[in-house]
Amino acid sequence: LNIEFWICGICNSDDYKIELKNKVRTDNVIFDFRFINNGEIPSLLSKVDIVLIPYNVESSLNSGVAILAFSYAKTVISTEIGTVLDFLDSGMVYVYNNSQNDELKNTLCSIYDEIQKDSHFLEVKGSGMLEYVRKHNNVDFIKKELAKVYL
C-alpha cells in the first residue's frame, strides 16, 4: 500500500514549520505551508483519501474543512471538535483525543488494517458520510428537528 501524507495550510510560525519537518523521518510526507485558496480545494481533495484535522480543541469548535471533506465523500479523522462530534453517531467519522499520543496512531493503524481487508473501505466510508450529511443537513430534516425542540 502506497501512502503519502500531505501537511497543508498556513503555519503560525517558522519555528513550528521547522519542528514539523524535524519530526518527519520519511520521504512520503509532503509539506505545503501556504494558504489554500478555495479554487484549489477540489483539486487537492481529489488527490487524498483521508482528511486529518488536528485542531486544538481548546480554541476550535467548528470546522468548515470537515463539512467540505464530507461533501467530497472523504473519510475524516479529527480531534474532538463540535462539528465532527455532531456526526459521530453516523459511525463514519474518526475522532481522537490529541492529548493521547497513541490514539491517532491506533486510529490510523485500524484504518490501514481495514483497507488491507477491503480496498474500497475508504470509498464506502466517504460515500456513506456524504449521504449522511445530505440526509441530516437537508432543510426539511432540520425544520423537523428544530420543531421538536422549540414547538
PLM ranges: what are they?
Residues 43-48:
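Short alpha-helical donor nucleotide-sugar binding micro-motif in glycosyltransferases
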Residues 53-67, 80-81, 85-86:
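Nucleotide-sugar-dependent
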Residues 9, 17-42:
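Nucleotide-activated donor-binding/catalytic signature segment of Leloir-type glycosyltransferases, i.e.
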